[in-house]
Amino acid sequence: MRGGATEPGPMERVRALCLALPEAFELETWDHPTFRVGGGRGKIFCTSAADGSTLTVKAEPAEREALLAQGDPFYVPPYVGGKGWVGVRADHRRTEWEEIAELIATSYCLIAPKRLARSVTSPPSLDG
């Protein structure tokens, strides 16, 4: 980046992607950020380590199997891994943020109320 500006870290990127989705909000739970949609405390569509180094998202069964077959950076997360969620390590230089944006959007659409899910026509972008 120019002018001495630093590139955003993983947590800033995860936060930006999640909060770009309609009516999404952040709530700290279990000492780390959770991203939610819906009324009240909402339903979780993404969780992240406090530093953004890992995140978990809900995936369609076939997509989840394909991701897990690739191995690193994908893994079965504790607690929710058996319920259709997949973990992603997002703390290395080769992190593909476009793919993470797609995974976050898919998770959001699986969790969000139908009226909100229908409004997502493309993954969120880090380009503002």
Short names for language-model regions:
Residues 1-128:
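Charge-dense, helix-prone N-terminal extensions
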